[in-house]
């Protein structure tokens, strides 16, 4: 069935100091383009290398961290921006930046090829979506069997005391995956029910990680039986031979759009526009589809190996305006309640 994408017009901590800065040199006269991103670090080289095949005169300098850290850094730098482009950031974060007047509007060439719910409806557009990532639960089948744990089928199952000390999930203050989880639980269960669910989940939680991929990686390595993460990370771990089962909770799963923007005031506007144009090209979209089952290019998405077949049907009708408008309050409440178990 058609996935309902409910977009509207409208991921400066010490962790950022450790963010990886990856530069891909091309020619001595290349324009240096500083690009903030929350995309997995292992995927960045192939994107830059493919881009540079067509545009060797633009040198991408990646600054990478989790969604929450990147978002906080951008907001802190609002009056003295350091990035030219943000590429691979949550839709709710981009909407906040738009409301703060931080974006340079630009409509990339070829935008007519995209689903119109994947880009800002203003003209020119302020933000454009690339793909969507979806929450899932990674279960190490060997570990749950060894510990005598039942296989969970729902979010509510994870509140059973039998799982105490066996769960790991991302901290929503640093992780976009963690925030989409919390936002989706509040939408699915209501505000009172959502916090009650998280209170019960917290009792079973071993710890909260900095990144969204870490819980699934830890489950794959056997360091925890169960990690709340996202489906692609589980699929990649399973493809590498890990004893992982990707569980799609029966109540539904949260998800987020990943997209890109140009930062207002950049001195490298033409290079930034070139990257925007390339980022919605068929070549780029085919690369995204290698790891994401949902991409913004119309009619392109193909099944991803090891993705559960029911995943897309379980994606909730997400209220991104709710997520963007309430982000600060949600994160403050979460931190007050649960931060004692964070890395």
Model-identified regions with their sequence ranges:
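Periplasmic-binding protein-like
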Residues: 113, 162-170, 197-202, 208-209, 240-264, 279-301, ...
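Short, polar/charged alpha-helical segment
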Residues: 37-61, 75, 137
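A ligand-binding cleft/hinge motif common to bilobed small-molecule-binding domains
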Residues: 92-96, 220, 224-243
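A bilobed periplasmic-binding-protein/Venus flytrap-type ligand-binding module shared by bacterial periplasmic
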Residues: 138-143, 183-186, 256-268, 287-288
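Extracellular/periplasmic bilobal clamshell ligand-binding domains
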Residues: 304-343
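N-terminal signal peptide c-region/cleavage motif recognized by signal peptidases
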Residues: 25-28
């Amino acid at each position: 069935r058609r996935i309902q994408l409910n977009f509207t017009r409208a991921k400066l901590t010490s962790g950022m100091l450790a963010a990886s800065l990856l530069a891909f040199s091309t020619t001595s006269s290349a324009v240096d383009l500083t690009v903030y991103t929350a995309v997995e670090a292992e995927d960045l080289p192939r994107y830059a290398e493919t881009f540079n095949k067509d545009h060797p005169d633009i040198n991408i300098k990646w600054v990478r961290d989790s969604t929450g850290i990147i978002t906080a850094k951008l907001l802190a730098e609002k009056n003295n921006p350091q990035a030219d482009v943000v590429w691979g950031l949550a839709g709710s974060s981009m909407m906040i930046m738009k409301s703060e007047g931080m974006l340079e509007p630009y409509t990339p060439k070829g935008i007519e090829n995209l689903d119109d719910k994947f880009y800002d409806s203003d003209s020119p557009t302020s933000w454009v979506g690339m793909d969507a990532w979806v929450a899932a639960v990674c279960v190490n089948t060997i570990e749950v069997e060894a510990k005598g744990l039942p296989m969970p089928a729902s979010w509510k199952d994870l509140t059973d005391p039998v799982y105490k000390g066996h769960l790991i999930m991302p901290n929503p203050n640093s992780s976009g995956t963690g925030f989409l989880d919390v936002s989706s639980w509040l939408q699915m269960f209501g505000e009172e029910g959502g916090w009650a669910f998280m209170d019960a989940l917290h009792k079973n939680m071993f710890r909260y990680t900095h990144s969204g991929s870490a819980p699934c990686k830890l489950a794959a390595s056997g360091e925890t039986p169960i990690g709340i993460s996202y489906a692609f990370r589980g699929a990649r771990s399973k493809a590498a031979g890990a004893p992982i089962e990707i569980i799609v909770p029966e109540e539904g799963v949260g998800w987020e759009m990943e997209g890109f923007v140009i930062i207002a005031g950049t001195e490298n506007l033409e290079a930034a526009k070139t990257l925007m144009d390339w980022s919605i090209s068929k070549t780029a979209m085919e690369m995204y589809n290698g790891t994401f089952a949902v991409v913004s290019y119309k009619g392109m998405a193909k099944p991803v190996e090891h993705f559960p077949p029911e995943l897309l049907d379980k994606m909730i009708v997400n209220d991104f305006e709710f997520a963007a408008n309430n982000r600060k309050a949600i994160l403050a409440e979460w931190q007050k309640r649960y931060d004692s178990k964070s890395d």
